[in-house]
């Protein structure tokens, strides 16, 4: 996949400024095309990374019980409106065969997947599927909570409304008690 074309983004932003009736040569917005291009390169940096690469660093640890990293902050851009949504991800897995990854690797996986034009549902599923594929755990559960600016500042205009999505894989799919335990850990402070 090609890297971000900063010049093309700058040109497009100038066209947008003109299309909304602003003067792209006005002092206040003169550098806006460059700033937006740099921002897009940053917020869409996940387009050029494989999130699974983070998970390949494993430690041989004889632990086959729950590992949960909760309240992982993330931001993304809604692929429908190109406006932000942001929130927290909670990632739980039950290791198998001594394959335990670094805790920061779970957060990096979330970030890489979120830093593309996205849907919250896809972030949730892709995080779970990536962990299942690379770590081959007994089970995975991912819960994502987010506020979407496309619902806050346009359309229905409901600030504060949160969307919650889940993805459950492996043994956790049929174990309601384990899912409840994970949810209780997520809710605890």
Swiss-Prot record:
It catalyses: GTP + H2O = 7,8-dihydroneopterin 3'-triphosphate + formate + H(+). Pathway: Cofactor biosynthesis; 7,8-dihydroneopterin triphosphate biosynthesis; 7,8-dihydroneopterin triphosphate from GTP: step 1/1. Disulfide bonds: none annotated. Homomer. GO terms for cellular component: cytoplasm. The gene is folE. It comes from the Bacteria. This is GTP cyclohydrolase 1. Coiled coil: none annotated. Zn(2+) binds at residues 78, 81, 150.
């Amino acid at each position: 996949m090609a890297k971000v074309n900063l010049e093309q983004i700058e040109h497009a932003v100038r066209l947008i400024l003109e299309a909304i009736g602003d003067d792209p040569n006005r002092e206040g917005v003169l550098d806006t095309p460059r700033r937006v291009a740099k921002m897009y390169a940053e917020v869409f940096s996940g387009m050029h990374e494989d999130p699974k690469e983070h998970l390949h660093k494993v430690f041989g640890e004889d632990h086959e019980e729950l590992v949960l990293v909760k309240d992982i902050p993330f931001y993304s851009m809604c692929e429908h409106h190109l406006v932000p949504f942001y929130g927290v991800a909670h990632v739980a897995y039950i290791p198998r065969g001594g394959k335990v990854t670094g805790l920061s690797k779970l957060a990096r996986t979330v970030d890489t997947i979120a830093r593309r034009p996205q849907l919250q549902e896809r972030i949730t599923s892709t995080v779970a599927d990536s962990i299942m594929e690379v770590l081959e755990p007994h089970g995975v559960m991912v819960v994502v909570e987010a506020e979407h600016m496309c619902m806050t500042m346009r359309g229905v205009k409901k600030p504060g409304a949160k969307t919650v999505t889940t993805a459950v894989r492996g043994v956790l799919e049929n174990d309601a008690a384990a899912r409840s335990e994970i949810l209780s850990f997520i809710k605890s402070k």
